[in-house]
């Protein structure tokens, strides 16, 4: 599977809350940092989906940059996200930066950060009045 295909499989698993698919795509020692600075493990992430504490209702890809070499890769996704988190509806435009490791011919997320994305520039910025 290509890194692009692995990233799209991860997004699909997130949208579906598919814990088995997420488990297969996350490295056992995966660590993440959320938009609030909180640090979470693979087990924390899987449990949030399994328990329903996090339910992603929309994850719409706006842009995706994929870079890879033989054993590692990085994906940078900007996405519009809507979710139910801890019983409350939340929406945000986020940047997901993921470090992937290739093991046994498959890609696994080793580390991830989620951060608020800058608003896109207005088309008329810098234009003449």
At which residue positions do the language-model features occur?
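A beta-strand edge to alpha-helix "cap/lid" segment located at domain peripheries
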Residues: 1-23, 31-129
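ATP/adenylate-binding site constellation spanning eukaryotic-like Ser/Thr protein kinases
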Residues: 27
